[in-house]
Amino acid sequence: LPICPSGAVNCQVSLRDLFDRAVILSHYIHNLSSEMFNEFDKRYAQGRGFITKAIDSCHTSSLQTPEDKEQAQQIHHEVLVSLILGVLRSWNDPLYHLVTEVRGMQEAPDAILSRAIQIEEENKRLLEGMEKIVGQVHPGVKENEVYSVWSGLPSLQMADEDTRLFAFYDLLHCLRRDSHKIDSYLKLLKCRIIYNSNC
């Protein structure tokens, strides 16, 4: 569902509609990333002990994101909006490479590839929607494009199968974690900004 019909000039969408769409999208992305992680885990990670190796060192860890709802509630909504944008931007590059590398996998399972493609597309749409929200909540504010650089591509291309599969596992684990955070923060923001915290 495009936010504005193509060719529409001065199209205005209410802030509530923008938030509704963003929450639906973020929830969908989180569901897809959970399904993709579970599929990968079932197909490639069984018996390899990846879960014990998956230290919580996602490339987005440098962005100081709140760990839970209680922490998130202490953060001013402007900061929360910036964090969401930062996390979304931080995934542009890894999602692009994830799709490319999954395509190159032997017998790349469609269940994983199709979800990776969808998540990459939906992440861009959610980022676009968030930028529109920022435009309405803080008109005229120049947004700092803060994001974390991902340097995990060489690991996804390793010749050693175990190392390579673990790199995929770790990336999908982080994607699931971050998509859950974004989903939670967005619901919190919608409650705060649209419903004046009465929800």
Curated annotation (Swiss-Prot):
SUPFAM superfamilies listed in its UniProt record: 4-helical cytokines
Cited CDD domains: prolactin_like
One example of a Gene Ontology biological process annotation: lactation
Cellular localisation: Secreted
Superkingdom, taxonomy of origin: Eukaryota
UniProt keyword list: Disulfide bond, Hormone, Lactation, Phosphoprotein, Secreted
Disulphide connectivity of cysteines: C4-C11, C58-C174, C191-C199
One GO location term (cellular component): extracellular space
GO molecular function, a single term: hormone activity
Presence of keyword Secreted: yes
InterPro entries in UniProt: 4_helix_cytokine-like_core, Somatotropin/Prolactin, Somatotropin_CS
PANTHER family assigned: PROLACTIN, SOMATOTROPIN,PROLACTIN
Function, in words: Prolactin acts primarily on the mammary gland by promoting lactation.
UniProt family annotation: Belongs to the somatotropin/prolactin family.
Quaternary data: Interacts with PRLR.
Protein name in the entry: Prolactin
